Amino acid sequence: MDKEILNADFDTHPETVDTEEELSNYLSEIAEEIGWIVIYFNSLEDQIAQCLREMMLRDAYQDERLDVFLAEMGYQVKARALVHLYGQAIAFGASRLPTQDLIDLEKALTEAAAIRNGYAHADWIGLRTEAYIKVKTRSTRNGVMHRYKRIDPEVAQMDVDFISSLRHRLEAVHELVLNQIYGQPSTKNETDVQN
């Protein structure tokens, strides 16, 4: 469960934990999942780059000049470019991937970035009671807002599983699209694409 609280509403912010021992125990319990989130997210980003190479070139290793551009692109730009390339293939009839599957994939890729950023930029040392962590601070016309997310080992494991499974889903979609473009039978089935 997330909570968004105005900075000025001090009384409504979750209380910080009482002891260093409590903080240390919590961090020890969740550190492995944080690491897996970073590892799987980085792998997902690499997979997106590989898919871009394959969508743009006949031989992904033929022209390393593309890597000059990919190295300068952030995750969101790479993900959006890949989704647009898939959309172009659909629009021109080269792929029969259902538009809703593409929309769902785009949303999932965006959600993966939000999850990863929440973990990467969270105030882990500022742990609050009931496992609330400040994951985002933003400025609005109403003042500064802090977003807290309850992250216990179970939630963290669900986030690990989501990002890990998204990479497999992307591989399935990519194989399906490429096989449709080049007229080859796919080894992936529709359930792989949707999950």
Language-model segments: residues:
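Acidic, Ser/Thr/Gly/Pro-rich intrinsically disordered interaction regions
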Residues: 2-39, 50-76, 80-195
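N-terminal signal-anchor transmembrane alpha helix
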Residues: 45-49
